[in-house]
Amino acid sequence: MRILSGMRPTGKLHIGHLVGALENWVKLQEEGNECFYFVADWHALTTHYDDVSKLKEYTRDLVRGFLACGIDPEKSVIFVQSGVKEHAELALLFSMIVSVSRLERVPTYKEIKSELNYKDLSTAGFLIYPVLQAADILIYKAEGVPVGEDQVYHIELTREIARRFNYLYDEVFPEPEAILSRVPKLPGTDGRKMSKSYGNIINLEISEKELEQTILRMMTDPARVRRSDPGNPENCPVWKYHQAFDISEEESKWVWEGCTTASIGCVDCKKLLLKNMKRKLAPIWENFRKIDEDPHYVDDVIMEGTKKAREVAAKTMEEVRRAMNLMF
């Protein structure tokens, strides 16, 4: 199966990216799928058009993170969106067959405008970003797209665009399927939505000492005011982190019973979480160190991967132009 997914370079990778996306990407890669993973730098401009000072830095950091987490350039194509100009051409052509009213009905359009109400998002680029997203997927004829639940609607719109193009012109595009992550979104360390603006994220490159300090300060079930007060793990962000960091069945039972009967304290629970987090993050930290030993490695990966992606995209665009009688 051909797989495609991407991330916007709007900051450092954090553990939400790891458990919500990157682990699934690696799994799909190791299952032998043909995987295309990219940095969506054009998509970053839809909400960060007014500050591009760190765009290049964040793009390279994202690729470093992909590599450190296990994306293998020998098995997957790793590329940068803006390096494949065919994405923009296909998005332009798709924009001819999608109505403005259809784009205004995309749920995330209003949600993001409301969430970022301090920014002027009344731009054409922000309105049509789902069209560019459809072009990102369809230009590689992807059959599967790993996404979170909040992106399923975008995959359905992509399927609609593929159907409409195939009906109007020629059978060029498959209809991709959403591949949902098994892990729900992690909350921030304070229990709220994980967000840089809240200061409640844990960066992947956090030091071991900082990780310990952060986890030990994490918010827990408000009902556990005293050590002797029983709690409910379902109301505790630490419990949600346990589920994401490979807690064993025996450990899970120990945490659940210990919390609900107050036979263990929150610090005991957090120490177990720390042990499991360090076990998962230690190889990633080591990979970052090895990657940084060669200052040219990341750029070489980007260059080679973008070249491979461009070759595939160019073939698709030949079919598209032929179907639309644009062969001049």
UniProtKB/Swiss-Prot annotation:
GO cellular component: cytoplasm
Keywords, comma-separated and alphabetical: Aminoacyl-tRNA synthetase, ATP-binding, Cytoplasm, Ligase, Nucleotide-binding, Protein biosynthesis
Residue sites binding ATP per the record: 8-10, 16-17, 148-150, 186, 193-197
Residues binding L-tryptophan, per UniProt: 136
Family the entry assigns: Belongs to the class-I aminoacyl-tRNA synthetase family.
Subunit architecture: Homodimer.
Protein name: Tryptophan--tRNA ligase
Organism: Thermotoga maritima (strain ATCC 43589 / DSM 3109 / JCM 10099 / NBRC 100826 / MSB8)
Phylogenetic placement of the source organism: Bacteria, Thermotogati, Thermotogota, Thermotogae, Thermotogales
